[in-house]
Structures are given as C-alpha cells and as structure tokens.
Amino acid sequence: MLLGVNIDHVATLRQARGTRYPDPVKAALDAEEAGADGITVHLREDRRHIQERDVLLLKDVLQTRMNFEMGVTEEMMLFAEKIRPAHICLVPETRQELTTEGGLDVAGQEARIKAAVERLSRTGAEVSLFIDADERQIEASRRVGAPAIELHTGRYADAETPTDVAEELKRIVDGVAFGVGQGLIVNAGHGLHYHNVEAVAAIKGINELNIGHALVAHALFVGFKAAVAEMKALIVAASR
C-alpha cells in the first residue's frame, strides 16, 4: 500500500506568521527520503496554506509524484493545465471550513464533474474524486469517467464509541469493495493518524492512503523524516 504525504500543514505553520519557514518543499523532499510514495498539496481558493510558488517548485524537484488537490473552479483548472501534475484530486471546498468536511457530491452535479474530469485528463493526469464511501457517489464517479476515487475517512476518524468506529470502518470496507468492483482505483484519507490508521491500512483493495496533519504534528517531536518513516512502517505492516 502506498503512502501519500500531505504537506499542507507545514505551509499552515509558515502562513501563521507570514515567514519563509518552515518550507513545505523541504518537508516534501524529506518525506520522499523517508519512504513517501507521493506528495499531496491542496491549493485552496483562499490560499490559507499552500501557495502557487510551492506547487511550481514541487513540480520541478519531486522525485516521486505530485497529487494536486483542487476545487472545481476555472482558476484551478487553468492552473492545473499549466503545471500538469501526475495526479489531480477534485475536492469540495468552502471558505468557512477548517478542513475539507465531506466528500464531493458527484451524483448531484455529474455534468459539471464529467466536464472537469475530461478536461483535466487531457493534461495526462490521473484524475480522482474525493467522495464519501457511498455507493451512489461511487457509481457516479465511474459514470463521469474518473479512473480513481479517494474515500473520505473523516467520519471514521471522528467516531468516538467502539460501535461508531466499527460502523464507520465497515462503511469504508464496503465502499472499497464496491469501488474496486466498479473498476476504480481506490485511495483513502482524511483524519488518519498513528492510532487509527492500521485498521484502514488492513483493508484489501486500497491503493494509497493520504495523510498529512498527524504527520506534521508528530514531526514536531521526532522530526519529519522519522514521522513519515514511522507511518509508512505502520501501513506496510498492516497491509501485508
């Protein structure tokens, strides 16, 4: 199973003071050295963390691949066509949210998402859709032509009781199986950390987990390379 390292919150720390440090590009290179299979960045409309310059630098220096998360806007479509990343993940986005709060409603806007997928696919990127583990959304993702999906694991991560955790984990398991059955590449992520990742990593059929905030937080105490290496080891062991 692959590990995609999201470096958004390295940039969050930088933007909090408007400084030049810490550098998310350095974090990305350290993550690659520690075993990351790819680097994920989300250029938000409000530019609260990652900036255009970060993305342009990463495109030039990454040894693995970039997974570019973006809202479905004309501004971001034009930017993605300019940088031509290896992977593009379409996500929902609102200015008020602290972080992405749910999956993209593909079923409710199929024509719009289909047009975006077709346009972005012409750049050569593998386009994925960040969605909830819901059969209706998974089927819609296939219909619009996306080759991949990323299942939102936030509800699992936020579950507090054993019953709720088990229920949300089953939702992910079922979603993965359904997605694979639809012929889709299935990734997953959001809210995963060192104490909840193993159950998700053990799910057969998941191609990649995208993890960020927990890695950045742990890196404050152990360093970024060690934080990434530790997460990678957990995922590899659980997915055997």
From Swiss-Prot:
It catalyses: 3-amino-2-oxopropyl phosphate + 1-deoxy-D-xylulose 5-phosphate = pyridoxine 5'-phosphate + phosphate + 2 H2O + H(+). One of its GO terms (molecular function) is pyridoxine 5'-phosphate synthase activity. The record marks 150 as: Transition state stabilizer. 1-deoxy-D-xylulose 5-phosphate binds at residues 8-9, 44, 49, 99. The keyword Iron-sulfur does not apply. It holds the Pfam family PdxJ. One of its GO terms (biological process) is pyridoxine biosynthetic process. One of its GO terms (cellular component) is cytosol. It comes from the Bacteria. 3-amino-2-oxopropyl phosphate binds at residues 6, 17, 191, 212-213. SUPFAM superfamilies: Pyridoxine 5'-phosphate synthase. The active site is at residues 42, 69, 190. Its EC number is 2.6.99.2. Keywords: Cytoplasm, Pyridoxine biosynthesis, Transferase. Catalyzes the complicated ring closure reaction between the two acyclic compounds 1-deoxy-D-xylulose-5-phosphate (DXP) and 3-amino-2-oxopropyl phosphate (1-amino-acetone-3-phosphate or AAP) to form pyridoxine 5'-phosphate (PNP) and inorganic phosphate. Homooctamer; tetramer of dimers. Belongs to the PNP synthase family. This is Pyridoxine 5'-phosphate synthase. The gene is pdxJ.
